[in-house]
A protein has these predicted regions:
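Acidic, proline/glycine-enriched N-terminal capping motif
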Residues: 1-124
Length: 124
């Protein structure tokens, strides 16, 4: 399964707050990004063949390859961005649990055009 996101990924670390009653909630910056990214994923899910759409959320062990292009040359917190992506994929019901992800390849491509993030998820 391949997915594309057009915006930069914020760090997922410290993206969630805890209320006094113990409930967790997303902080404003992360929630804004997650809403936009979720909308992009939902538009892509609608175009999936019915057989592939019925297999969501993906189950079992997964391997993920991420091609990430930055708009600028600033340093990025890759583990934090991975956290944000795992939260997003779980939130949009692409995957059931981030514990399923057994392998990750993070690639900084030479491309200067196109989307910021290209995600390929492979089962098995």
């Amino acid at each position: 399964m391949k997915l594309v996101l057009t915006d930069q990924i914020p760090s997922g670390k410290n993206a969630m707050g805890v209320r006094r009653d113990g409930r967790h909630y997303p902080k404003a910056r992360f929630e804004s990004w997650r809403s936009q990214a979720s909308f992009e994923i939902m538009k892509q899910k609608v175009k999936l063949p019915l057989t592939q759409h019925m297999k969501l959320p993906l189950l079992g062990d997964l391997t993920v390859t991420i091609s990430y292009r930055t708009f600028d040359n600033t340093l990025r917190d890759v583990p934090g961005m991975l956290d944000a992506l795992w939260h997003l994929l779980t939130h949009t019901q692409i995957i059931e649990n981030d514990g399923q992800i057994k392998g990750v390849a993070w690639i900084y491509p030479w491309r200067t055009e196109g989307p910021c993030v290209e995600i390929e998820i492979v089962q098995g």
